[in-house]
Amino acid sequence: FDKSCVQDGKFQFGGQEIRCNVLERIDRSQVENGYIYAFHAPNINVDEGESLLAKYYLEVFQIACMDVCRQQIQDYLERKHSVLQKQYCSLSFGPGYYGMDIDAVPKLISFLEADTVGVKWQEDKLYPIMSLVGVYLISKGELLAECKDCAGCLGQAGGCQYCMNR
């Protein structure tokens, strides 16, 4: 998506607005463009008779797969945009992180053909359960260097103005 979609405290995609508080704190003039993504971990069924430990190991494996995927996508986007000059790919902005509300999930999914990669929004949940949706920003410089404390921010309607970490 175009850099004009990145505004003060929000992403604006056509008529849809998605609050993301950290956008109040970054230098938006550095942003070149962005990407919305969705993917899921391998969907492996565990028999009911399996031990609790086996189920735990499977969940840890799925979480590790998603972390690796997110990092691979970030690295790929940074390489892709750094052919002529150095560009940076931000960490993933997503619902529940960097001040983006969980309610952003169905909005982000609606912009993608997520079902082509097996991800869908149904009954107020992402399916499969181990799925992710989010945003990467490509920029001329490091965007989040001074916003490390924002990573776990769940967001609030008032934005960053009342944040004690600001």
Each predicted region: which residue ranges?
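Cysteine-cluster motifs in flexible loop/terminal segments that predominantly coordinate metals
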Residues: 133-166
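Intrinsically disordered, low-complexity, compositionally biased regions/tails
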Residues: 13, 18-19, 98, 122, ...
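Internal, well-folded beta-alpha domain core
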Residues: 52-114
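A generic "cationic amphipathic patch" detector
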Residues: 50, 86, 163-166
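Short, hydrophobic/π-rich interface segment
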Residues: 92-145
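Active-site helix-to-loop segments that bind/position phosphate- or nucleotide-bearing substrates
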Residues: 1-54, 58
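Generic structural hydrophobic/aromatic packing signal, biased to beta-strands
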Residues: 37-39, 108, 153
